[in-house]
């Protein structure tokens, strides 16, 4: 089995967003550098649904950039790559599908000590367990 966050990273790279894990895409940590990053983290979801073998998992995306415009633009680019109410089923990889829905749209989260801007949004992803 693969990891949901890695599979979402693979999907984003294929969509032209980000280049590689540990370069500008990260999981579960916000590194000090580079300045521009996309960070995916999983937090508490809901248990497996009876009869379908899938769980409603929760994923947070944090985008950091040097400017408000860049952070907002990148955040919305990631959001739009993952969220489409008319086509909610995403094939992240050949072996991983997910039904993606937004818990909220991208919003400014904070400005860090280096004056970099962070935007955040949260998703629900119904997908088989890892």
Regions found by a protein language model. Name each.
Residues 1-51, 85-95:
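Small/polar-rich, solvent-exposed N-terminal microdomains that initiate assembly or binding
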Residues 18, 83-130:
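Acidic-leaning, charged glycine-interspersed low-complexity segments
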Residues 31, 52, 110-114:
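Sterically constrained small-residue positions within well-ordered secondary structures
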Residues 53-71, 78, 115-127:
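Oligomerization/assembly interface segments of phage tail-like spikes and tubes
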Residues 68-74, 90-95:
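Short C-terminal domain-edge/linker segments immediately following a structured domain
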Residues 69-70, 76-84, 105:
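Surface-exposed, low-hydrophobicity beta-strand/loop segments enriched in small/polar/acidic residues
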């Amino acid at each position: 089995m693969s990891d949901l966050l890695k599979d979402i990273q693979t999907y984003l790279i294929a969509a032209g967003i980000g280049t590689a894990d540990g370069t500008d895409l990260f999981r579960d940590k916000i590194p000090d550098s580079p300045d521009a990053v996309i960070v995916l983290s999983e937090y508490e979801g809901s248990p497996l649904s009876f009869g379908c073998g899938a769980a409603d998992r929760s994923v947070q995306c944090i985008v950091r950039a040097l400017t408000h415009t860049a952070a907002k633009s990148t955040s919305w680019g990631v959001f739009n790559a993952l969220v489409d109410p008319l086509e909610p089923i995403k094939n992240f990889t050949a072996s991983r599908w997910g039904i993606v829905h937004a818990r909220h749209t991208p919003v400014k989260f904070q400005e860090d000590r280096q004056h970099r801007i962070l935007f955040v949004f949260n998703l629900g992803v119904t997908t088989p367990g890892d």
